[in-house]
Structure formats: structure tokens, C-alpha cells
């Protein structure tokens, strides 16, 4: 009898400790995953939930993400030691701070951006001191930039979100043939020289939402992901057949602009075209489907958004036969 009582007490105690320790373990596990203060995680592109298509997360340079977690602890040290030789450092090279093993990318905090940028115009600008350069990625978010800074030749990923850049010049990306992604979300860009992106043959993702663009420049044909949401794009600002040669284009996000027509012809590679909240009133019957070819030629294009436009989609019943799904929008 006493043994039985002891056993049930033991069971109770075990149950208690078991449940009590569970949340603690869970909490600890979460804490370990959380960035610590000073880790500079705010520069990472991983929180861009709003504009993520299915694969946007997959193409993020995860190797760099790991590097960043590795070097978090060294941040304060590097910051202090690497600021001194600012004037002599060429921005085209990856700089290595004294005391940091040479294989490490330089980590600096972008806190001195305003100072350095205003005192050192144009060449000689130590981009990797005001921005964070990690491998082939350059992070320049939210440091009051007014221009694209000179970039290291090997730059493949550029993030310069939340700045005050108003213009992109033809020479800004000249010779940066390794660039795969340019993210200039949330700037004041109202003009882009026509040649600014044209020769960037490696460019896959061009991300320009929340700017003031009325027109698009010539785009390189390798682009897979084009995001120009929340600008002032007009149909006259998009060249006729601007997207036709872009045979890798999968995501075309042009919502919340001033377009009054659907820009066509659209490449067959498209999976997603967002045109909601524009001024589209009508459409060409062949903008999606080729009336000559009675086939389901657009199996990929599953996501067409035309809601928030004055168009009555019921008026174009013959425009959708090749699509796997009807567009989203007003049908009555
Ligand atoms: C939209 O078009 C359909 C088909 O012609 C028509 O029946 C409907 O009344 C139209 N709706 C509006 C709001 O104009």
C-alpha cells in the first residue's frame, strides 16, 4: 500500500517536472534561434513576407546567412578597428580589418554612413565600411543613401532598401556583371537611365517597390522576378513588347500603379502577374491566349490579379481559354 502511494506520488512528481520543463526547453530553443542584439540581423532579406512569391525565399543567399551568424560576436571589435583607414581603402576590394582572420568578410555597422558619405564624394568611398559586405552580398539598408554607392566588382546581391535614392544612373552598375539581385525597395527613385540595367546579364531579381517610377528602363532579358509595385507607372512608361524577350520572367508584380492597360505580349514563362489596383478598363482578347492556337499554352500562369481595376472581366469570355485558372477580379 505504501509502495503504491509512493509510486503514484513519484509519477505525479515526474509529470510535474516533465510539463514544467517543456516550455522552458522550448523557450531556450527559441532563444538560441533568435538574433542577439548587435547581430545586425535587420539587414537580412528574410522578413520580406509581403512580396515573397513561392521561390523568393529559396533564392536568398543562405550561405551568407550562416556567415552572418558566425561573425555576430566579433562585431564590436571589427567596427572599431576598421574605421581608421577609411580614406585609403578602395571600395572595389573587400577590406579586412586588422585582427580578423583573412578569410572572414569585413563586418562593419552602417552607423557612420551619413558622415562618410557626405565627406567623401564619389570615388574612394569605402562602401564596405558604410554598408555591410558579406561574401558577394552588399547590405546598405536604411543609411540615408542618396545615390548607389560604388560597389565591389564581385557584388551579386545588393540590398539598399529604405534609403533616399532618387535616381539610378547608367554608370551606377557599370561592369557589375555578377549582379543577380538588386533590391531598392522604399526609396525615392523617380528616374532610371535607360541603360542602367541593360547589360546586367546575370540579373535575376529586380526589386523596386515603393518608389516613384513613372517609366521602366530597358531590362535585361534574364530577369525572373520583377517587382515594381507601389510606384506611379503609366502604360506609356512601358515600352511596347517590353517583356516579350524576357523568356525567364516568372513573377511580374505591377500592382498599385497607374497602368490603364495590360502590358503585353507576356512571355510564356510567366507564373504570376499582379496588376491589381491600377486603372485598367479593357484588355486585348489575345493578351493571355493566342486565338490561333487552341491549346492550353499557359499552364504556368496560375496567378493573375486584376482586382481593383475598373475592368469588367465578364466582357472578355474568350480571353481566358488557355489559362489554368480565371484571373482574379470583377466578373459581373
Ligand atoms: C459586366 O459584363 C456582363 C457581360 O456583358 C454584364 O452582364 C454585366 O452587367 C456587366 N457588369 C457591369 C457592372 O457593367
UniProtKB/Swiss-Prot annotation:
LRR repeats lie at residues 154-175, 178-199, 202-223, 248-269, 270-290, 300-320. O-glycosylated. Proteolytically cleaved by MMP1, MMP2, MMP3, MMP7, MMP8, MMP9, ADAMTS4, and ADAMTS5. Proteolytically cleaved by MMP13. The degradation of OPTC by proteases may contribute to osteoarthritis pathophysiology. GO terms for biological process: angiogenesis; articular cartilage development; bone development; collagen fibril organization; negative regulation of angiogenesis. Residues 1-19 form the signal peptide. It holds the Pfam family LRR_8. Expressed in cartilage and synovial membranes (at protein level). Expressed in the retina, iris, ligament, skin and fetal liver (at protein level). Expressed in the retinal pigment epithelium (at protein level). Expressed in synovial fibroblasts and subchondral bone osteoblasts. Glycans are attached at residue 312. Residues 116-153 form the LRRNT domain. It is found in: Secreted, Extracellular space, Extracellular matrix. Residues 21-41, 86-106 are annotated as: Disordered. The modification Sulfotyrosine is found at residues 65, 71, 139. Residues 29-39 have a biased composition (Basic and acidic residues). One of its GO terms (molecular function) is extracellular matrix structural constituent. Disulfide bonds join 289-322. Transmembrane segments: none annotated. Keywords: Disulfide bond, Extracellular matrix, Glycoprotein, Leucine-rich repeat, Repeat, Secreted, Signal, Sulfation. The record marks 20-21, 32-33, 87-88, 114-115 as: Cleavage. One of its GO terms (cellular component) is extracellular matrix. It comes from the Eukaryota. Homodimer. Inhibits angiogenesis in the vitreous humor of the eye, and therefore represses neovascularization. Binds collagen fibrils. May be involved in collagen fiber organization via regulation of other members of the small leucine-rich repeat proteoglycan superfamily. Belongs to the small leucine-rich proteoglycan (SLRP) family. SLRP class III subfamily. This is Opticin. It comes from Homo sapiens. The gene is OPTC.
